[in-house]
């Protein structure tokens, strides 16, 4: 069992809402001169879930799940920057308004540049959400440390997710981290 400082990290309540899908508002042109327009960042993406293939979708930088923001008009300012920093992979996210009120999901991570926090919910929950709904994230994980491995730095990781990762201590002060998929270096 990995020893951590999980009992001493700060936990915030963070509020966000789904952000509508974004577009450049223009068509792009491929290397053969063909115009195209593809779905991109943001939105409530109904048909992509955790575990689906990352490649092969007719999209560009599509975010699976629900792309959330605290402020769609000022994504790089407070309170959205706090949402970005304090929400961590594995944090519990609860819908607190609308038809999906009470539904629980989990933070997948962030999409830098778009300043979105991406939350995974089952499809049936996503189908009930609207862009005015409110979601509360229990932000915890920043400051998490491994007591016996101070050279390993943890960022954006909920301690409960760390515990579920089945990481084992191996000989020679090493950790064995299970891997489920090998992603090729070139797409």
Q: Where in the sequence are the language-model features?
A:
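Conserved mixed alpha/beta catalytic, RNA-binding, or beta-rich assembly cores of soluble enzyme
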Residues: 5-187
